[in-house]
């Protein structure tokens, strides 16, 4: 038997020394959000940290970790003083529960969003679509880790190769950083609004800028404020430079991307100096980012989320009350009556705090510089087209008088240092001259058919706007049934799914464009994005050739902004309205008269010398020619695809209603089957029963669905022929055999020449003249 070893004396087990750390100096890591989650709410942007305990000492939350922990650098650690309360190590040997790794939406790069299948009738269906694998978050942790003192590191702004941009250098004294970025982005010369706005804005005066859609308004106000960011880079105590408000989240993210692209060398060391603060993303992360030194010097925000941040932290009110520039992008939408009351509250909070600073001699003697930009500044444009009221006669002698009236309206809502300088680069018309408008007349129940006809006859990248979300969902399924790639975006979708749809649409459009460029003889297909008016303002989607108004918009300003999604950056595009006879007598007439008002004024002034009569509103938009023989061949396909779309949407809706009812009954301990009779007899549920019966009538049994799909696929496999020609390919006015051999003519319609909506409208205009 061996002897027991005696315990050694004098040795004591020492616990690792603990320290209290600041939460803003921890190396937080983003967590990955799996695609299996349909809606993760406000947890997008969630971040985690391991090896840190949370203690509440005297009612104050503190973060405690071991001295040898790797959660932050040694230089950032603070030792616990002798007079501080010792913290027990409660971590013990218990293994930490594994957390699901999600990836922050803010950190998803372009191209990483999944390219899913095209069929998606509802937002919930999109969550189940198989998506491509995301990159391993461990590979790019360093890109998102919030390192310390990143804003205090020096950057050599002059270490940039010189460029030759005479039109930009003659415009204003721009830094080499911006000139180099403009050169890299191939912005070789400024647009008209940029030429007139940038020098005036850099003088510090208030500006109201009006320009047509796609004319470069973002850089018109973006370049001056980025110049301030670059000039203030070496200062230690940096106050906020600019607050930019946009009406939609998508526009806020787009403006953020544009500003970051023109100051990439600065953001390489100060990546959070330009921040986007919008709803739908984690407010906790946004609060933490704002606590970092010199972060958020330029903030692009939606009013709702920014007001929420101000009310949660009063120090932000004092901080942003010292801002130099206040910018309203799409200002007409922000300041409409009944919209965005949050913006008025924000201005009130900042003004009260700024006046306090002025009394204490902490702030400047004047208020911030105010810049407002939009494509539409007219009170008439906000009138509802569906209203039965007559259009008010608000004719002005000239465009300047009208804008002065608009300024008086705006000054009642926001504050200026003085009367703003008016810069109007589009006084002659409200719709961009690069947009060719057209009208498609159709029966009220055949909008789908005429929309399908347009996409078949004029393939390309198309954006379709609907007034109702239900129409967006149905049209998406309808076009997918016909083999046309279609994506959807509307206000009921979460922010993640909106961005996914936009990314997929851009990827599919770029893919089809590459195929057509490399092989001109390949079959050209349409790529379609179907949207509600959430995508009508400000979004810069490259390569959109056509805009279709499935429904006439509710007001004229919405029509202008919808149409402005095409013909951007100097290109031309087509805007087509699908209109029924009932609409042509009311909303269409009011729309065209409102748009023709300004032109008619200038025409009236010129008619005194030329003796020409003003153009009637009926003649301001040409009809798109419709070939009835091709339309008749598409009719049966359209009918089958529409019935299948109604069945799919109704079935999904009924399934969700049943699941919700069963879940609620289980939680309450109620037998659903026994209460169905009582529910059916209740007068209060009559509307619900009628709605359910309508959905039931649209459903089809499985056997009939299979038969209809087989019939539809068979019809889609049969090529469309012009004039229904089935025999004698070498006869007639067009030699079909020769066109087939030489791969000439329309890709989808045999015997038809290649068509282009833009060229078709131009030719028709020449014939009319």
UniProtKB/Swiss-Prot annotation:
The modification Phosphoserine is found at residues 138, 674. ATP binds at residues 211-218. The modification Phosphothreonine is found at residue 135. A motif (Q motif) lies at residues 167-195. A motif (DEAD box) lies at residues 329-332. CDD domains: DEADc_DDX24, SF2_C_DEAD. Residues 198-395 form the Helicase ATP-binding domain. SMART domains: DEXDc, HELICc. It is found in: Nucleus, Nucleolus. The keyword Plastid does not apply. Residues 83-99 have a biased composition (Acidic residues). SUPFAM superfamilies: P-loop containing nucleoside triphosphate hydrolases. Residues 448-611 form the Helicase C-terminal domain. Keywords: ATP-binding, Helicase, Hydrolase, Nucleotide-binding, Nucleus, Phosphoprotein, Ribosome biogenesis, RNA-binding, rRNA processing. The Q motif is unique to and characteristic of the DEAD box family of RNA helicases and controls ATP binding and hydrolysis. ATP-binding RNA helicase involved in the biogenesis of 60S ribosomal subunits and is required for the normal formation of 25S and 5.8S rRNAs. This is ATP-dependent RNA helicase MAK5. It comes from Saccharomyces cerevisiae (strain YJM789) (Baker's yeast).
